[in-house]
Amino acid sequence: MSIYPISLVNLKNYLAVIIGGGHVAARKLASLWDTDFQIKIISPSLCEDILSLTTLKRDSPVQIISRPYQVGDLRNAFLVIAATNDSQVNEQVWIEAVQEKCLINITNNPAKSNFYNPSILQYGSLTVAFSSIHGCPALLSWLRKQCETIIDDDFIELFEATQLIRIRLIHHYPNNYDIPEDNRIKWENFNNHLISILEKEGVFAAKKAALEFLKKMP
């Protein structure tokens, strides 16, 4: 089995449904919270973590349906998470999700899922994901810790500076092919120069170079 990694964006008009109200459902809700998904939770009871999160903001994006799952609850859903301990409920959710052509994750049954959530590091708009089919969890955990040591405050500021540079380029030249040749060469040379500084002098020096380049942009 192979995987197809993607990042979902522009989700404002899409519905995500969580079946279940326990701690696993709470973690899944937290992972969806900062997306633009419309979120629906269906469960006869909710744990304190879910109650705290959904009452945190008046404009909460979450609709709560306080009853057990029923066939038909996944109509118009794009993404579905079943986080219950009832295998019969999970099986029925899986059947309906397949019929409705939803993305479906049964949290305790990978065989009845067509997606799962990787381990992630999130720093603003920078997301680093760790995922493997049948890989060693300890090795992935070690790799994650290595990345955590690399991605410090200076690296985040470097990333944000390069992001602003690209945003300004896109603003001035919405069509990538319209970038004048001299500007294109300047940008490509800067990219190569930045990586060279990063490798030879470290993150702080690269951040300084990126900020200086940003100041010179129109």
Where do the language-model regions lie?
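Hydrophobic, well-ordered beta-alpha structural blocks that scaffold small-molecule cofactor pockets
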Residues: M1-S45, I50-L53
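Residue-level detector of alpha-helix initiation sites
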Residues: G22-V24, Q88, H134
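Hydrophobic beta-strand scaffold residues
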Residues: I39, I64, L103-I104
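Short loop/edge segments at beta-strand edges and connector loops
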Residues: S43, I64-P68, N108
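Glycine-rich, highly charged phosphate/nucleotide-binding loops
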Residues: T55-R75
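ADP-ribose/adenylate-binding Rossmann-like module
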Residues: L79-N85, N90-Y116
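E1/E1-like adenylate-forming module used to activate ubiquitin-like modifiers
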Residues: I106-I156
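An accessory alpha-helical subdomain
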Residues: H134-P218
